[in-house]
Amino acid sequence: MKIFVFEYASAGVLGATPLLTEGYAMLKSICSSLSAAGHEVHTFLFSEINELGIRPPADKIETYSSMHDAEKILSHVDACIPIAPDNLLYDLTKMVEAKTSLIGCPSKSILSCSNKDETYKIVSEVSKYFDVPEYETLPLENDPVVEYCSEIGFPVVIKPVDGSGCEGVSLINSKEEITDAIKKVSYVSMAKKLIVQKFCEGEHMSCSIICSKSRVLPLSMNSQRIKISGNISYLGGISPYPCVHKEEIFEESKNIAQNLELSGFAGIDLLVSGDKISFMEVNPRITTSFIALSNVMRTGELLVSCVEDSLPASVNLNGFGSVVIFPLKRGYDLDYKKILQIPEVISPPFSEEGTTLISVKSPSLYGIVDEINVVQKKLRDLGLLC
């Protein structure tokens, strides 16, 4: 099968952006998994990445100049995997749906999931096990936000109604921090509203699922390393990860996926505290956990099975995989040849104030920590880490 992987950031559609490192890592992982499954892979690559001699394992790599280029490729392939920020994914998916087979969530599902308020309401109605933390949808104005925060008490989380992942999300401990949090939402959101939610303690986890027309197949529970202080950011995770509530979460994830009519790979973010499982959001697209899972299962075969509606009844996970995003110290010597000599580096930094993303595998959960420490030392020896 000829498959076009259109990853927005690494294609250069957004220019030089902080999303490049994570975007290229996902592109490389998807291309590798599809190639390993015997498929012909087409993709775009940002010229600035190509000039560094960094290329994903694809059969045909082209330079993006306009959406017309994408439309030409779509007319000559059997299927497409679109990956983009949530506020851009809807239009991109609509274009794919008009041209070829889609490996991913349909546009109508993306539209539903892009509105956190709507998603919370659906989950509240259909969920047996998941709790939706207390929240309110408010305008991008200081007074109503201050009033609601005073009502529910600090700390609170302020985030865009239409955001994805940790983008534009802030942990707020006092009313003096609210103005800056609203500004941050306005920078990344196309909506004129935000969500204020009571902050909940717990372990950050996600459930990865893959969906076809007739089946929802839970793949794994994943740990998530989230930096909780002011600006909230994702730093990586481990897949699979033990969870005593796995069976209940798998059952509930199937239920939510069916109600939202998800397709392809998707992730459900959760907060687990004792017996309480709090729902955070649905990511209707391939997430960073896919990279870790590609170390322990045949993800390329599963992606194609979505189009063919031939998902297996279950999957075997061979060991444990992990993704870690390392922030780099300022003023380091950016030597790509040295960085890429570290095989675990799946995506190098593309700016002097960027990050690098590594992917490791181990037969045991405890071995993952050792593998991460080994790579961390290699990066530190190169002078990239503090």
Name each model-derived stretch.
Residues 1-19:
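Nucleotide-activated donor-dependent transferases that construct or modify glycoconjugates
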Residues 44-140, 147:
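Conserved N-proximal alpha/beta basic substrate-recognition cap immediately N-terminal to
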Residues 123, 149-171, 190-202, 207, ...:
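ATP-grasp fold ATP-binding core
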Residues 263-274:
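A short glycine-rich, hydrophobically flanked beta-strand micro-motif that places a catalytic Asp/Glu
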